[in-house]
Amino acid sequence: MKSVVTTVIAAADAAGRFPSTSDLESVQGSIQRAAARLEAAEKLANNIDAVATEAYNACIKKYPYLNNSGEANSTDTFKAKCARDIKHYLRLIQYSLVVGGTGPLDEWGIAGQREVYRALGLPTAPYVEALSFARNRGCAPRDMSAQALTEYNALLDYAINSLS
């Protein structure tokens, strides 16, 4: 995978010139976004349990019927699996922040998810609610910088859209 740095250097070299000011600004922007993604990944890692628990609770608050007998969240086992899945999505978002792309979400979270949930009779709306809560609870500068929050929210939106 080529980085912005290698792309800029290759283009300048092919043109027989030094990287221009705009080339260097592009590299600087890429480095700043990478730093913001790493900040968001670190903050999420440090708070994953709290974020996942709050997201799970928000999901159950919006869909209390899930706790009814025979529903998707009616036993302790189902509750644990739902909480585990929410935490799994958040972990994949953290991985995606680190790598700077949606690869981990695409490969380990999104591919085939609708079919699996449909086959198991699991609604996706509660997961959408949980991830939406995680998105809406973030606050700059309380939780992270504005740029880090932008990077984090973009990946949450990506996951939410894939489940919608």
Swiss-Prot record:
Q: What are the GO BP annotations of this UniProt entry?
A: photosynthesis
**Gene3D superfamilies in the record:** Phycocyanins (1.10.490.20)
**Single GO cellular component term:** plasma membrane-derived thylakoid membrane
Give binding positions for (2R,3E)-phycoerythrobilin 1. C82
Q: Where in the cell is it found?
A: Cellular thylakoid membrane
Chief location: membrane
Topology of the protein relative to the lipid bilayer? Peripheral membrane protein
Asked if the keyword Electron transport belongs to this entry, the reply reads: yes
What post-translational modification does the entry describe? Contains two covalently linked bilin chromophores.
User: InterPro entries recorded for this chain?
Assistant: Globin-like_sf (IPR009050), Phycobilisome_asu/bsu (IPR012128), Phycobilisome_asu/bsu_sf (IPR038719)
Q: Kindly summarize what the UniProt induction comment says about this protein's expression.
A: By green light but not by red light.
| Keywords (A to Z) from UniProt | Antenna complex, Bile pigment, Chromophore, Electron transport, Membrane, Photosynthesis, Phycobilisome, Thylakoid, Transport
> Binding residues for (2R,3E)-phycoerythrobilin 2, per the UniProt record?
C139
Q: Which family does it belong to?
A: Belongs to the phycobiliprotein family.
Q: Outline what the protein does.
A: Light-harvesting photosynthetic bile pigment-protein from the phycobiliprotein complex.
Matching PANTHER family, A to Z?
C-PHYCOCYANIN ALPHA SUBUNIT, PHYCOBILISOME 32.1 KDA LINKER POLYPEPTIDE, PHYCOCYANIN-ASSOCIATED, ROD 2-RELATED
Note the subunit structure: Heterodimer of an alpha and a beta chain.
Q: What is this protein called?
A: C-phycoerythrin alpha chain
Q: Which organism is it from?
A: Microchaete diplosiphon
Give the encoding gene's name.
Answer: cpeA
